[in-house]
């Protein structure tokens, strides 16, 4: 059997890692061993970050809805309960957008929620 030299594959593998490490400082960019560790850790952080992003945005939406609901005389939990009882099924993302960009529209929703809570 013929001898297989793996220089091409090794160079390709190294180049792939070093390309991913572009923008890092010092040895993390230049030395393959260190760059590989840095890239693996960065990918772990990126994976975790994608999960945290969902939590963070939901938290932000809830904070915005709560602030707008309190301006209209309701707490967040009572507002959401009123929305449920009124049969209004808008998700938190949309409600937060309405709260930020359309105060009058949110006030109308708050009144409907108050009415549903009173009934």
Swiss-Prot record:
Any single GO CC term annotated in Swiss-Prot or TrEMBL for this entry: ribosome
Protein keywords: Ribonucleoprotein, Ribosomal protein, RNA-binding, rRNA-binding
Annotated Gene3D superfamilies: 6.10.160.10, Ribosomal protein L20 (1.10.1900.20)
InterPro entries referenced in this protein's UniProt entry, alphabetically: Ribosomal_bL20, RIBOSOMAL_L20_CS, Ribosomal_protein_bL20_C
A GO MF label: structural constituent of ribosome
Highest taxon of the lineage: Bacteria
Classification via Pfam families: Ribosomal_L20
GO biological process: ribosomal large subunit assembly; translation
Function: Binds directly to 23S ribosomal RNA and is necessary for the in vitro assembly process of the 50S ribosomal subunit. It is not involved in the protein synthesizing functions of that subunit.
Family recorded in the similarity comment: Belongs to the bacterial ribosomal protein bL20 family.
Xref: NCBIfam families: rplT_bact
Name of the protein in its database record: Large ribosomal subunit protein bL20
Protein source organism: Xanthomonas campestris pv. campestris (strain B100)
